Amino acid sequence: MASLKEVKTRINSVKSTRKITSAMKMVASAKLHKAQGAIENMLPYERKLNKILTNFLSADLPVESPYIKAREVKRVAIVAFSSNTSLCGAFNANVIKMLLQTVGEFRTLGQDNILIFPVGKKVDEAVKRLGFEPQETSPTLSDKPSYQEASELAHRLMEMYVSGEIDRVELIYHHFKSMGVQILLRETYLPIDLTRVVDEEEKQKEEEVQGGEIANDYIIEPSAEELIANLIPTVLSQKLFTAAVDSNASEHAARTLAMQVATDNANELIQDLTKQYNKSRQQAITNELLDIVGGSMQ
């Protein structure tokens, strides 16, 4: 049995750890609240963009764009979102696992034809361990997502796709649903699937109270071609920003939950060690009393 001093030292050590995990939980919770605010502010804009595109497509107007043309995949780009720091449960491990599966599916293309854009230090480190050369991305897009940085990466991917440098772009990120639920997603970013955008908008319409419907016989100025040329890149930039914000909120939610579990475990361990300390102390006192009584009887 451990000595009283050893048990006391362990109790103090666990209490110190509990202070750290409790503080990290509060910090992560505050950051999560901020990230949720960013999502709430972003959603109306995203829905409006999708609604404009949906209304445009429902008018049966011709849609021509280099971003919707699918072709044989000879070179692929993968954009994976992780965190810059650890202590967030299985958040990063799940992203890396999904990345490994995705890379495995495209192995036949050859390593030189798989371009990985890591957003976050943890996935960047994993890419290097896999033997790939990570493509450069913004170092702050993971922990402080901004539309400007997301738009720059989106336009870079669009330029590579239009030029034929890559034939497909996939995203791997966590979608934030709630404090306890973050869904790992793998989605095709390019070529853009306009029918999916329409389906998402239709689902949103079903959840809303139906008002007056807008007629589909649009008069478009200056032209439908120019509208599409500007609208689809905007939708793609917004999509990448949405993934970054979703991933950021999911990270903080995962860290808040992980630190809560760590704090609860520390509390349980302190209780067990305190019981052990009291039991050892009681045993020591009993032994001393027996020694005193035994000595007086001699």
Swiss-Prot record:
<keyword id="KW-0066">ATP synthesis</keyword>
<dbReference type="InterPro" id="IPR035968">
    <property type="entry name" value="ATP_synth_F1_ATPase_gsu"/>
</dbReference>
<dbReference type="GO" id="GO:0005886">
    <property type="term" value="C:plasma membrane"/>
</dbReference>
<keyword id="KW-0472">Membrane</keyword>
<dbReference type="GO" id="GO:0005524">
    <property type="term" value="F:ATP binding"/>
</dbReference>
<comment type="subunit">
    <text>F-type ATPases have 2 components, CF(1) - the catalytic core - and CF(0) - the membrane proton channel. CF(1) has five subunits: alpha(3), beta(3), gamma(1), delta(1), epsilon(1). CF(0) has three main subunits: a, b and c.</text>
</comment>
<dbReference type="GO" id="GO:0046933">
    <property type="term" value="F:proton-transporting ATP synthase activity, rotational mechanism"/>
</dbReference>
<keyword id="KW-1003">Cell membrane</keyword>
<dbReference type="GO" id="GO:0045259">
    <property type="term" value="C:proton-transporting ATP synthase complex"/>
</dbReference>
<dbReference type="GO" id="GO:0015986">
    <property type="term" value="P:proton motive force-driven ATP synthesis"/>
</dbReference>
<keyword id="KW-0997">Cell inner membrane</keyword>
<dbReference type="InterPro" id="IPR000131">
    <property type="entry name" value="ATP_synth_F1_gsu"/>
</dbReference>
<protein>
    <recommendedName>
        <fullName>ATP synthase gamma chain</fullName>
    </recommendedName>
</protein>
<comment type="similarity">
    <text>Belongs to the ATPase gamma chain family.</text>
</comment>
<keyword id="KW-0406">Ion transport</keyword>
<dbReference type="GO" id="GO:0042777">
    <property type="term" value="P:proton motive force-driven plasma membrane ATP synthesis"/>
</dbReference>
<keyword id="KW-0375">Hydrogen ion transport</keyword>
<keyword id="KW-0139">CF(1)</keyword>
<comment type="function">
    <text>Produces ATP from ADP in the presence of a proton gradient across the membrane. The gamma chain is believed to be important in regulating ATPase activity and the flow of protons through the CF(0) complex.</text>
</comment>
<dbReference type="Pfam" id="PF00231">
    <property type="entry name" value="ATP-synt"/>
</dbReference>
<keyword id="KW-0813">Transport</keyword>
